[in-house]
């Protein structure tokens, strides 16, 4: 009887997996077919879809908030992900405004990137075109559903989305509004699809060669590592940010205080938030002043021995801890950071090279030569001088919304706006020429 039971369970599991595989294949085929139609949809029509979607978010905000409340009810309020998951009326208005901003941007398609006439009379044009189908894997951030769709649609790309299970209800409600907006403007609704929030669905997307043209993971280091190690489709790495700010021997304390506070506390759950403050040993006496604004935000500091000694009587005891090796490579995504004392800019650069993630780094100094030295030698997508890393954002860079912050070197790097979501093809015009 036990053997028969095991066989039954095995067959049932196999059947469920088979059904999932067939369903996913149907989705990928439909989206791929729809992507070819979307590539030739007029920009005015794409903009109309986005305007309709923004209107729906404002008009049906209660539907989104109700779905979001069901997701929030399953999550611990103390979790660092709670803030990322939470929607409210203000955030919905921001989402609608961001979608309208995307609609107002120039189309990134059909731009002539280069044009030349060869000696044989052939006319070459390098023209921007969509990727085709973009797959995006992300965690508990329902706003990403709207961000990704609006950018994909505006850039002529279809999209397959795989959100985290924590935001399942919110994502379903968001995709329902997206499909309504597409249908009302005569655009095939299958240009955007939400996959089930299962590990199997993620694996299928990452291996959908021939259907998904590029995959973009948005989340923490574990998610990005999993996608990079598992995917057979091309991947653009985004998201994970172990971010440092170096306070140089010639740094201005007041600037440093403001920059450190803003970079660390403006929004702790985003990838551009400060994770490690590095201070020149010649400015050790200024560490309490640099850190004092953080106490009001209950920021826990993991300090090395030198920093701990000077903060011991100048920072709340319950918020001060001894750093370990692991402290420096941690993306905290919380009210916490590491603190390291170094002997000069070169040691700061070495520390960043060892523990950073090539995302965003900053130097606070009044010495221009030191600033340029730091900017040239630090390997990161964005390197700041006397400004907080919180500015690493597509909107702040004037790119409109972004699909993520790319930390790789091949392909897009830094905030990925509309232009970074296109590729190109060569158009070659001739008049009967043949190659000798």
Please report, for each region that a protein language model flagged, where it lies by residue.
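Hydrophobic alpha-helical signal peptides and transmembrane signal-/tail-anchor segments
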Residues: 8-17
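Rossmann-like NAD(P) dinucleotide-binding subdomain of oxidoreductase/dehydrogenase enzymes
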Residues: 104, 113-254
């Amino acid at each position: 009887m036990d053997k028969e039971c095991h066989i039954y369970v095995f067959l049932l599991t196999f059947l469920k997996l088979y059904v999932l595989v067939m369903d996913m294949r149907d989705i990928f085929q439909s989206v791929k077919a729809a992507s070819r139609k979307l590539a030739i949809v007029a920009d005015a029509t794409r903009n109309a879809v986005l305007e309709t979607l923004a209107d729906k978010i404002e008009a049906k905000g209660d539907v989104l908030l109700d779905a979001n409340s069901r997701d929030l009810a399953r999550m611990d309020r103390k979790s660092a992900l709670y803030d990322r998951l939470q929607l409210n009326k203000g955030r919905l208005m921001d989402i609608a405004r961001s979608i309208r901003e995307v609609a107002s941007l120039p189309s990134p398609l059909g731009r002539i990137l280069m044009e030349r006439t060869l000696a044989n009379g052939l006319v070459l044009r390098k023209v921007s075109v969509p990727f085709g189908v973009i797959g995006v894997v992300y965690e508990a951030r329902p706003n990403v559903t709207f961000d990704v769709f609006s950018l994909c649609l505006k850039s002529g790309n279809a999209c397959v989305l795989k959100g985290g299970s924590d935001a399942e209800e919110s994502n379903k409600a968001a995709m329902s509004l997206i499909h309504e907006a597409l249908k009302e403007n005569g655009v095939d609704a299958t240009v955007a699809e939400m996959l089930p929030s299962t590990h199997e669905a993620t694996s299928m997307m990452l291996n959908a060669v021939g259907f998904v043209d590029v995959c973009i993971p948005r989340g923490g280091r574990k998610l990005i590592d999993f996608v990079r190690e598992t995917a057979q489709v091309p991947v653009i790495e985004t998201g994970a940010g172990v971010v440092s700010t170096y306070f140089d021997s010639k740094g201005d304390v007041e600037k440093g205080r403001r920059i450190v506070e803003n970079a660390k506390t403006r929004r702790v759950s985003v990838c551009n938030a400060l994770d490690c403050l590095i201070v020149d040993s010649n400015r050790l006496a200024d560490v309490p002043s640099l850190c004092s604004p953080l106490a009001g935000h209950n920021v826990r500091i993991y300090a090395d021995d030198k920093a701990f000694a000077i903060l011991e009587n100048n920072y709340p005891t319950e918020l001060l801890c001894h750093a370990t090796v692991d402290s420096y490579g941690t993306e905290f995504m919380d009210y916490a950071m590491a603190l390291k004392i170094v002997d000069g800019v070169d040691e700061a650069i070495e520390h960043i090279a060892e523990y950073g993630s090539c995302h965003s780094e900053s130097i606070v100094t009044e010495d221009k030569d030191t600033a340029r030295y730091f900017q040239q030698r630090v390997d990161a997508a964005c390197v700041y001088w006397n400004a907080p890393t919180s500015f690493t954002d597509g909107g702040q860079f004037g790119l409109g919304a972004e699909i993520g912050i790319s930390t790789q070197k091949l392909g897009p790097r830094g905030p990925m706006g509309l232009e970074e979501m296109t590729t190109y093809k060569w158009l070659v015009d001739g008049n009967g020429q043949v190659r000798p």
